[in-house]
Amino acid sequence: MGQIKVRDIMTTQVITVLETDTIRDATITLAVDTLSGAPVIDDDYHLCGIISEMDILNLIMKYEAELKVENPVLHLLAFPMDTKFDDPDLEAAAAKFSKTPVKDIMIRDVITTTPDAEIVDTLALMLEKDVNRVPVLEKGVLVGIVTRSDIVFSIYKRKI
């Protein structure tokens, strides 16, 4: 049996975020599509980085130190993003958080693979670097993504 290539199991309809999107936009994308992270691209589908739930949560925690309100993180987490707050400092922080560009908090140093790479090698890299997803690039353009879930599903389907 031949080696399984990344192209055999990768997802080709990749949900992405633009580097110019706001954190509000990215949060909506991740929440609606129930994703823990997504590739960040430019207008030409070139990979710029990755944004994850952790990046967004770290940004929320940043405001903990800046605000004088008791438990500001609870305020930011407990209400929808479009909520207007009575406290002007909290309102300003919520607006600043929502309008922060994705490019300001995304991870830029991203592990990538190609469609012709062997999935076993990609999995080993994912485990070594402790990443959930690896963008698949062809000539610098995002053509897919392979996730731990894709690999587990392939094991279930006996592709691996």
Which role does the model predict for each range below?
Residues 36-68:
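Generic detector of contiguous secondary-structure segments
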Residues 33-34, 130:
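Short, basic and Ser/Thr-rich N-terminal targeting/leader segments
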Residues 127-129, 133-134, 148-159:
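Gly/Ser-rich helix-loop-strand patches that form or flank binding pockets
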Residues 57-73, 152-160:
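A short, polar/charged loop-to-alpha-helix boundary motif
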Residues 49-57, 137, 144-151:
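Short hydrophobic beta-strand motif reused across regulatory alpha/beta modules
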Residues 1-29, 35, 40-42, 47-48, ...:
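Bateman/CBS regulatory modules and CBS-like beta-alpha motifs in cytosolic regions of diverse proteins
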